[in-house]
Amino acid sequence: MTVTMRQMLEAGVHFGHQTRFWNPRMAPYIFGQRNKIHIVNLEKTMGKYNEAMNYVRKLAANRGTILLVGTKRQAREIVSEEASRAGMPFVDERWLGGMLTNFKTVKQSIKRLKEMEAMVEDGSIERLSKKEALMATREMDKLKKSIGGIKDMGGLPDAMFVIDVGYHKIAITEAQKLGIPIVAVVDTNHSPEGIDYVIPGNDDSSRAIRLYARGVADAVLEGRSQALQDVVAAGSDEFVEVQEDGSDEQA
């Protein structure tokens, strides 16, 4: 789904941070200032946003996985909702150090979480003592909170989408170490350096965050849908219809 400049304006994408907190590396994306607040150039944002969404669309069409990361209060619910809608992994609580760089260990925790969920589902947790069941439930809830969003990721993601680069420095460093491309919303108080696909704009407003996350989810779904259509089209080209004329029928 395409996003218009009007929608960006209504969501407050153009409102940056206070001018005294600005990062000079964001200068190319700044239009000016109003009441000591930097105003982001939405023409630049539109171009960069579309470039980022095209990348996500192609990635999804090629069955790629994009990890959505938004752990600050106003982003959590939005990120988990939109990632779930697109069938993509997400981190909406605290980023655990080593989530990518030490994924082998994280996989062990995922295995443990799945085992415990299976115990609840098949009722075997009820065979534990009251104390053991309580401890197991607490452990499961803790694991769900920290890694529930990535339990079906399988392996390292092909890309990562981040809301607020300053808030997620560890996640970004890990992705960079592993050569995982990063799509990120960068506000006027942060540096766009090291980000593969920069979306210059407000990273605090929940309406702006919803616009970005919905855009990523839509791009994923569009990419997958297009890939499916291509498969169907390729299949129909190979299909030859055989008509029965009934000439071989016996009386």
Curated annotation (Swiss-Prot):
Tree of life domain: Bacteria
Pfam families: Ribosomal_S2
Cited InterPro entries: Ribosomal_uS2, Ribosomal_uS2_bac/mit/plastid, Ribosomal_uS2_CS, Ribosomal_uS2_flav_dom_sf
GO CC terms of this entry: cytosolic small ribosomal subunit
Gene Ontology biological process terms in this record: translation
Cross-referenced CDD domains: RPS2
Stored NCBIfam families: rpsB_bact
Name this polypeptide is given: Small ribosomal subunit protein uS2
Protein source organism: Aromatoleum aromaticum (strain DSM 19018 / LMG 30748 / EbN1) (Azoarcus sp. (strain EbN1))
